A protein has these predicted regions:
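Helix-loop boundary and gating motifs at the non-cytosolic
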Residues: 2-58
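Hydrophobic transmembrane alpha-helices of multi-pass secondary transporters
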Residues: 10-22, 86, 114-126
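Hydrophobic/aromatic residues within the transmembrane alpha-helices of Major Facilitator Superfamily
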Residues: 20, 24, 57, 61, ...
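Hydrophobic/aromatic end-of-helix segments at the C-terminal termini of transmembrane alpha-helices
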Residues: 29-37, 101, 138, 142
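C-terminal ends and interior cores of transmembrane alpha-helices
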Residues: 81-113
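Cytoplasmic helix-loop-helix junction between adjacent transmembrane helices
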Residues: 123-146
Length: 146
């Protein structure tokens, strides 16, 4: 009986920890990156609109793709681990897009286009792997465990 209690405590710590990490990452992505783009890349809301649209497509594709794969493979923890790690890496790398403009809003059209493209691509990759780890992996695993 005591062994089952220990397993239950570990399980709930894992559920709480992974859930917290996932929500913190989504919060950082959704709250901070829009203001980052506006402050460091360009004061142009069109870039943010493109970011939102492309990342919505990326997350939808990732959820269907990795959700199906994890259903067929039955190893959701692998998708959670790989997805969360890559999500974290691309979240960190997103900040490097600031270097394209030197930390100031873009001054020329070519620099602006390069920076805007880099931001949209970085956000799409970050959202893709976030969806792999959190939506297709963690949420499905949690549902299986309940």
């Amino acid at each position: 009986m005591e062994k089952k209690r220990t397993r239950d405590i570990r399980f709930w710590v894992l559920v709480w920890g992974l859930g917290l990490v996932g929500q913190l990452c989504w919060n950082i992505e959704n709250q901070w990156f829009n203001t980052f783009v506006y402050a460091k890349i360009a004061k142009d809301p069109t870039i943010i609109s493109w970011m939102v649209a492309i990342s919505a497509i990326a997350t939808t594709i990732a959820t269907f793709l990795f959700g199906t794969l994890s259903d067929r493979k039955g190893k959701r923890k692998n998708f959670i681990g790989i997805g969360y790690i890559l999500w974290g890496i691309f979240t960190i790398l997103f900040g490097t897009t600031e270097w394209i403009t030197g930390g100031q809003p873009a001054s020329s059209a070519q620099v602006l286009m390069l920076a805007a493209t880099a931001v949209v691509c970085a956000d799409a990759l970050m959202s893709f792997f976030g969806s792999m780890g959190n939506d297709a992996g963690y949420n499905a695993w949690l549902n299986d465990m309940m």
